[in-house]
Amino acid sequence: MKPFVLVLFALLALLQYRLWFGENSLTEYFTLKDRISHQQSGNAELLERNEVLKEEIQDLKSGTEALEERARNELGLIEQGETFFRVVGNDSRSIRSSEQSQDNQ
């Protein structure tokens, strides 16, 4: 009876080793599960991006307003008869340097 128990114990140890450290082990399972969840979240982000791009393409194909807006923003185009004004704000560094020069006087 004792050799039978030893064989069963050895078999159990072998199966436990395969479960924890062998091919398709629990550590590999959890690693793959984590990689799958990361991949799925990346896929979801890409799907959202694709939807935004599809909407933008549809908007550009269907109307001239989006095309005109894009030309104005990205290319700086203006319509005939329009006057372009560039508003230049005060730079905070130049204000500080002028305040410092006034303090030094």
Curated annotation (Swiss-Prot):
GO cellular component: cell division site; cell septum; plasma membrane
Protein known as: Cell division protein FtsB
Membrane topology value: Single-pass type II membrane protein
Cell compartment(s), UniProt: Cell inner membrane
GO-annotated biological processes: FtsZ-dependent cytokinesis
Family note: Belongs to the FtsB family.
UniProt keywords, alphabetically: Cell cycle, Cell division, Cell inner membrane, Cell membrane, Coiled coil, Membrane, Transmembrane, Transmembrane helix
Coiled-coil features, chain-numbered ranges: 38-75
Segments in the Periplasmic topological domain: 22-105
Gene: ftsB
Cytoplasmic side stretches: 1-3
Self-association and partners: Part of a complex composed of FtsB, FtsL and FtsQ.
Residue stretches spanning the membrane: 4-21
Species the sequence originates in: Shewanella amazonensis (strain ATCC BAA-1098 / SB2B)
Function in brief: Essential cell division protein. May link together the upstream cell division proteins, which are predominantly cytoplasmic, with the downstream cell division proteins, which are predominantly periplasmic.
